[in-house]
Amino acid sequence: DCHKEYDEHKTVEKYNDMLNLKKKLLKSSNAKTDLSHNMIENELFDVVKKISSLATDNDALSKCEPLSYNVMSIKEKIPFNNLLCNDVEGLVSSYFLYIKDLFKSLDNASFEAIASSFKHSYCQAVRQQLDQEDIFETLVQWVKKKTQCANSVARIIVSYFIQNCDVYGKLSR
């Protein structure tokens, strides 16, 4: 029915809408394909497990010190999407220090390898000319696929790397 409706009542506007949707889906598919080849460091699996355990461990977050923002704000990193910005700010406010402590327990080289893989994946998504929300969702799907974690955990981890300037930060040339 949809195809028949489109064929019989096609307008330039409907055609352009369909073309733009196709281009957006193609970009998203290309970005996911690019990221599917990127590896996740083994140490990230431990972090994923500990974040996942927060569902039953009420005390873990209360041990963290209050968050202090002294870096580029999330609003500066995500200026054109208030919903995404608010979502990321909430996740960062709740989990950033906890995850930072988890990463402190790793040796510096392991953390740098994980951060580099996020930066590399982010750059690949940017190359596909995805908008910020599509980049966020592509990275979330990448983390989920590579670590087999829940969507909520993947969103927390990607938000951490946004605050940590590995995603949406200024890219050096």
Model-found features: residue ranges?
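Polybasic, low-complexity binding patches
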Residues: 4-46
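C-terminal, charged low-complexity interaction regions
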Residues: 64-173
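Hydrophobic transmembrane alpha-helix bundles
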Residues: 9-12, 49-59, 145-151, 168-173
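Residue-level signal for secondary-structure boundary elements
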Residues: 30-33, 52, 56-59, 107, ...
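Short HxH-centered metal-ligating active-site micro-motif
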Residues: 1
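Short flanking/linker segments adjacent to small metal-binding domains or redox-active Cys/His motifs
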Residues: 36-79
